[in-house]
C-alpha cells in the first residue's frame, strides 16, 4: 500500500513539475512572440529588435534569434549601399530583377560642389573627408525627407530622382529638397570654417522628363538607376549654374509641372553642351506659400 506521506510527496512533485512546465511554456511563448514580432519589424525595415534585449537560453531559440539578427544586419547594411526604396521593392517582390527598364516621368536631381578640386588642395585629407561626409548627409537627408531616391554618388556629385512610386507631386518635392540642401549647406559653413575646413557652395540642376528606370547591368552586378536624355539634361543644368551665376537651375518642364508654386527668375533660352535646341530655363529662388 502507498502511504499518505508518499501520496503527498507524489502530488507535490506533480504540482512542482506542472508549475515548471507552465513557467517554461510561458517563457517559450514570450520568446516565440518576440521573434515573430521582430520578423514583422524587419519586413517593414525597422531594425530595432526586441529579442536582442531579451536573449533566450534555449539552444534552438538562440539559433533563431541569431539568424534573425544576421538577416536584420544584412538588410540594414544592404540598404546603405542600395536605395532603401529599391531594397524594399526587391524584398516585397515589387521590383523584378529580370524585368527590363520601364519608361516613367521622373524629376531628376544633380548636386555638385562648386570648386571642389581647389578646396581639396587647400585643406587636409582628414578635414576634407569629414566635410564630404557632412555634405552627403545633408543632401541625402533632404532628398529622403521629400520622398526621393538617392541613385548614386559620382565623385563629389549626387544624383537622385523622384516619381518612381507614382507620386504626381514629385517636381515640387524635388524643388523643396533642392532648397533645403542650399539652406542647410549655408548654415553648415560657419562650423566647417571653425573646424579648420572651408565654406562650400553647391550647384543643383532639376529637370522633369520621361526616362527609363529600372535595373541594368551584367548577370553578376546590377544597378537600379534612371537613364536617358532627361538624365543628361539634369546633369547639364547643374553644370550650367557656373556660367549663369546661379545656384539652382531648373527646366521649363519642371516649372510647368509645379503649377505656379515656385518662385523663379527666368534665365531665357539657353543652349547646353551636346544639345542643338535651346531650353527655357529658370533659377529657383523659393516656394510660393498658399
Range-by-range predicted roles:
Residues 132-148, 164-204, 229-240:
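Alpha-helical scaffold within the catalytic cores of cyclic-nucleotide enzymes
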Residues 1-10:
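Membrane-interface helix-start motif
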Residues 27-73, 105:
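HAMP signal relay modules and closely related sensory coiled-coil linkers
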Residues 97-176, 224:
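Catalytic NTP-binding/metal-coordinating core of nucleotidyl cyclase/transferase enzymes
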Residues 13-29:
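Cytosolic-side ends of inner-membrane transmembrane helices, especially those
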Residues 73-110:
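Membrane-proximal coiled-coil signaling linkers
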Residues 160-161, 198-214, 249:
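A short glycine-enriched loop-to-beta-strand structural element that forms part of the catalytic core
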Residues 211, 240-290:
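Cytosolic regulatory/linker segments at or just downstream of nucleotide-handling modules
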